[in-house]
A protein has these predicted regions:
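Histidine-centered active-site/metal-ligand motif
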Residues: 1-7, 200, 258, 346
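Short, well-ordered coil/turn elements that cap or connect secondary structure elements
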Residues: 15-17, 214, 356
Length: 409
């Protein structure tokens, strides 16, 4: 009996040829929480099946850690059932009996740390994803099916190496894309259509997102494919990418998406036509490209304590529709700058407030880009989230800086 667990809710006109379609977003479905990811739909189906068969559904609890990873990495709302799944999965993840998952946590030194949703979304998830992006998803699948600890360790290390390669490829792609982006922006393009012929198609969307974040312009990154060129786009508030693509659909051989992201394929000869038409139709104005940052409270770093950070952790897990609180401090003195990381993209600032409080601030950004912004300035105004940094058994207060600009004395 074929099943289809279509959680995306996109199939509105034609149902797939299955005896059962499990989709909580169907109009006729009265399931109370329709925002599950695919793994969540499958998990709740298994629970219902166990209950119907009068089996002990506690046997499914071992899967909660995997479900937490899927829920965070699928970027669904962390509300309702999703929030419970992630919270329970995080609570159990260090006790997992899955040899492959344990190996993946160990290779990132996570077993000795408190694991939160950030680790799932930005450390564990990308490693799993890198397998499918650069090779085959089979490697990640085999890791979680592995019963031999040594083989699991080896596969986990291979996945980490693949993800490190993906990071390097992404950084190189971003640098190349930025060069083009600045050029087209200077010419007056509002929508940045960037062509990177050597870019691996699986990271085009990541690069487009980075360009969008950096310049706050809608951005497409296209690369060579077997037939023509293909790529992905990422948008900003106020610009529905899919609707705008519909207006120039004649240039594509295939396209799809939603307001904030899209994918497309086209003949290489149509590239310039696409760039020209998408910009001619664009009604965005200069004010639309100004980055808007909403903070929760203007709070000097002098108020940060270990106890405050522990209290904030009650709000975890953070993610879509349950974002971390964002704080701000105006005018911190930058006493020292240190740069770390293989790609020189981890910036550590020694900061001092006007009241004399000293604290480290972390910025994850290319060194050249950071130093260009800083110039000779000595003071920084920033938004941040406070964390506890653990290193060799020593704990210290630290802020992770989200947005910033430099100010004069």
């Amino acid at each position: 009996m074929p099943f289809d667990t279509d959680e995306a809710g996109m199939r509105k006109e034609v149902l797939p040829p299955a005896d059962v379609v499990i989709n909580p977003k169907q109009e006729a479905c009265n399931y109370p929480y329709p925002l599950l990811c695919g793994a969540g739909v499958a998990f709740q189906f298994m629970r219902a099946f166990y209950q119907a068969m009068e089996e002990d559904e506690s046997q499914l609890e071992e899967l909660l850690s995997m479900l937490a990873i899927a829920t965070v990495c699928d970027v669904v709302d962390l509300t309702g059932e999703n929030r419970i799944f992630v919270k329970e999965g995080l609570r159990r993840i260090k006790d997992t009996q899955n040899i492959g998952l344990k190996a993946l946590l160990n290779v990132h030194d996570l077993m000795d740390k408190q694991i939160q949703s950030y680790a799932l979304g930005f450390i564990v998830g990308p490693c799993i994803n890198a397998s499918g992006r650069l090779e085959s998803a089979e490697k990640a699948l085999n890791l979680f099916l592995e019963e031999d600890e040594e083989k699991a360790k080896q596969t986990a290390e291979e996945l980490k190496e693949l993800n490190d390669l993906r990071k390097t490829m992404t950084e190189n792609g971003v640098k190349e894309a930025l060069g083009q982006a600045f050029e087209y922006e200077a010419k007056g393009d509002k929508v940045l259509v960037l062509y990177l012929p050597e870019c691996h198609e699986s990271i085009a969307g990541i690069i487009a997102g980075r360009i969008k974040d950096r310049l706050n312009h809608p951005a497409f990154v296209l690369t060579d494919a077997k037939e023509g060129i293909k790529g992905s786009g990422r948008s900003i508030e106020g610009y529905s990418m899919f609707e705008e693509m519909m207006k120039v659909k004649e240039v594509f051989t295939k396209f799809g998406g939603h307001p904030m992201a899209a994918g497309c394929s086209l003949e290489k000869e149509k590239l310039q036509e696409f760039r020209k038409k998408i910009n001619e139709n664009c009604t965005l104005e200069k004010k639309d490209f100004a980055k808007k940052v909403q903070i929760d409270i203007d709070m000097p770093v002098d108020y940060i304590t270990m106890d405050l950070i522990h209290q904030l952790s009650v709000l975890e897990p953070f993610g879509k529709e349950n974002k971390k609180p964002l704080f701000a401090h105006r005018k911190l003195k930058v006493e020292r700058v240190n740069v770390f990381g293989k790609n020189r993209n981890v910036i550590k600032l020694a900061l001092k407030s006007g009241q004399g409080t000293r604290i480290d601030g972390m910025i994850f950004e290319d060194e050249d880009e950071f130093r260009e912004k800083m110039g000779t300035a000595k003071y920084i105004t920033c938004t941040y989230y406070p964390v506890i940094n653990e290193y060799q058994g020593y704990k210290s207060l630290q802020i992770n800086i989200q947005n910033y600009f430099f100010v004069e004395e």
